[in-house]
Amino acid sequence: ENYVEAAHTFRNRPDLWKKIEEGALSSNAAMREGTQHMLSTFKKNPKKYTPENIEHIDMKFGKALDDICPNCRYDVKFREGQKPLFEEFKSYNSETWSKIANDKGFIKQFESYLQEVNKLEDLAYMINSNKANINEVKQAFKELFKKEADNLFRFPEEGGLGLEKIRKLFGRDIKNTSDFLDKAEDINNPIYNFIKTN
């Protein structure tokens, strides 16, 4: 597949062009693959991914599970008023997805997104459907929610999201951890709508 055309759209934005070029020419295979995944998504939806709509692109990879980023930065941040506000491109295979519930770096990154957004539709995890099935990914997040529910419900000053924020993101009908876990049990519940395929 040719991504040059999608990349060239950003020539007039040197800040974005530089990030795309860095990713595409990286000696790190996972970073190159992640950049291709992002560009192939850009190519499929050129009206959404315009230089005018994107505020920032940031692809940082660290030494963690399948290069999960330890410094918790988004891949694409859209300008205020765009939906979503943040997109995180994940080119993981099924095996890697199955490990996210036990990966502190992944959990920390996900929680930092949840703290950053006001509505769940402000966040999208763009998965590479050539490497994993969306239901496998939802299942992996279900395990993460089950494992992390108590931490998410902690007060913000204790590192959690707190009940108010959870209700804002996942539904006003949530009164406690058990309500949240009931929703998480069904991978077709709207709480999983932030998981998208390209």
Predicted regions and their residues:
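Acidic-basic catalytic patches of nuclease active cores, encompassing PD-(D/E)XK
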Residues: N2-I68
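Surface-exposed polar/charged interaction patches
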Residues: A6-R13, E22-S27, T41-N45, E116, ...
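Alpha-helix boundary/N-cap detector
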Residues: H8-R11, D15, S26-A29, E33, ...
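Short glycine-rich, low-complexity/disordered patches
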Residues: K47-K60, D122-K131, L152-L161
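Short secondary-structure capping micro-motifs at structural edges
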Residues: G62-D66, Y74-D75, F110-L114
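Active-site beta-strand-loop-beta-strand hairpin of nuclease catalytic cores
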Residues: D66-F89
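Catalytic cores of nucleic-acid endonucleases
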Residues: K83-P84, F89-R154
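Non-catalytic C-terminal interaction segments of nucleic acid-processing enzymes
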Residues: K147-N198
